[in-house]
Regions:
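Dinucleotide-binding Rossmann-like beta1-alpha1 core, especially the glycine-rich loop
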Residues: 57-136, 258-260, 297-299
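Flavin (FAD/FMN) cofactor-binding core of flavoprotein oxidoreductases
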Residues: 131-137, 156, 289-366, 372-384
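A short, basic/flexible loop-to-alpha-helix module at the beginning of a structural domain
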Residues: 1-13
Length: 403
């Protein structure tokens, strides 16, 4: 059961209001409460993990092209492995590794550079040949790939369990959670956050942290802050029990098409793919039209799975940004409006480290890395509060290893 209190009134005051009850908001609530911050209030418009964090299984990895993402991913992996002790919950972590399938020299070169950057930061990834890739994942046809990138410490876990674990630990440390409590307005005065309005009352507060996922642009606008986040539907499907049961395999994905698959329990597979035809929007109904391009894509690498049966599926939202990198920082335009959103599919895996980062931004501590390059204003060529812009011509920094 989620540690929610839908029927309780909102408090009249809070030191900090977190908007969004997904894994990012839950992690931040835990890290703030653990640090001794009194008056932490998390508001969720629906129920915890109702948005992007509701995905049944979420990948965790440190294989990225951007050094910032590598560092955040590695630190988060350490926290996921220790989650049973801190904050104390079973998240079903399966450290089966990630296996990126590469079909040509250009892809191999891109991942060779990524592996070099990852190794320099302590991530044990490596490039492997087709035979070794097929040994790790027997569904693969080694004649249909050129190489693969593999990291044995990557894997997947259960987002819902992580959200519940974080929130329960936060509540034990004094945080408050209100569900079915959407934020309808944010009051500012003198360039600083003053209050948050909800259908259940107004909360006077000196700080707001936006973790509203696909709805973050709307929340930011309430405070006069531009958060360039666009919602896009993503879908996954499940085979149900297979006979014979699948072997234990890595989280395996074809880089060119984003088609991926991995174990789902003991006897089935989870299937997924980013459909390039999908238009932005908030629709979350599951449909099967994407399975046709998925089957065509998987036939290129693992022909044995091209006709695998599908029993059911799930649809959720990616919160995307123009460069597929997160928005993390504090607004220079609305004092004490912080944000952690726009993760473009890697929010779950980065949640532990992001909780640390936002905690330190809120407390004025030196974070373990400079998040200035992830400021929402990078697309305008401006740095976030207390950081540097960096990146591309506008300050953007495209992430290549996106699913």
């Amino acid at each position: 059961m989620h540690p929610s209190t839908a029927s309780a009134p909102v408090p009249a005051r809070a030191a900090v209001v977190i908007v969004g009850g997904g894994v990012l908001g839950a992690s931040i609530a835990f890290h703030l409460a653990e640090a001794g911050v009194a008056g932490v209030l998390l508001l969720e418009r629906d129920r915890p993990a109702a948005g992007s964090s509701g995905k049944p299984i979420g990948g965790v990895r440190a294989q990225f092209s951007d050094p910032l993402n590598i560092r955040i991913g590695r630190r988060s992996l350490e926290a996921w492995r220790a989650f049973g002790e801190r904050p104390g919950a079973d998240i079903g972590l399966a450290s089966v590794g990630y296996l990126f399938l590469l079909g040509d020299a250009t892809e191999r070169g891109l991942f060779a550079a990524g592996v070099a950057a990852q190794n320099a930061l302590g991530v044990p990834s490596r490039l492997i040949g087709p035979a070794e890739a097929a040994a790790l994942c027997p569904y693969l046809d080694p004649d249909r790939i050129l190489a693969a990138a593999y990291c044995p410490t990557d894997g997947y876990a259960l987002p819902g369990a992580a959200v519940t674990g974080y929130l329960r630990a936060a509540v034990r440390r004094g945080a408050a959670v209100r569900t079915h409590c959407p934020v309808t307005a944010i009051e500012t005065s003198g360039g600083t956050v003053r209050a948050v309005r909800t259908p259940h009352g107004t909360v006077r507060t000196g700080a707001v942290i936006c973790c509203a996922g696909a709805w973050s642009a709307e929340v930011g606008a309430m405070a006069g802050v531009r958060l360039p986040v666009t919602p896009v539907r993503r879908q996954i499907a499940f085979t149900g029990p297979l006979h014979p049961a699948p072997p234990r395999i890595p989280f395996t994905l074809d880089f060119a098409t984003t088609a991926y698959f991995h174990n789902d329990g003991a006897d089935g597979l989870l299937l997924g793919m980013s459909d390039p035809r999908q238009k932005p929007g908030f629709g979350r109904e599951f449909s099967r039209e994407w399975l046709e391009p998925f089957r065509a894509a998987v036939a290129r690498r693992a022909p044995a799975l091209a006709a695998v049966p599908v029993s059911h599926g799930w649809a959720g939202l990616y919160e995307t940004t123009p460069d597929n990198n997160a928005l993390i920082g504090e607004s220079a335009d609305a004092g004490r409006f912080l944000y952690a959103t726009g993760f473009s599919g890697h929010g779950f895996l980065q949640a532990p480290a992001v909780g640390e980062l936002v905690r330190d931004l809120y407390l004025g501590r030196e974070p373990f890395l400079d998040v200035g390059p992830l400021a929402a204003t990078r697309f305008e060529g401006r740095a976030g509060k207390g950081g540097t812009a960096g990146g591309g011509p506008r300050g953007d920094r495209p992430e290549a290893h996106i699913i």
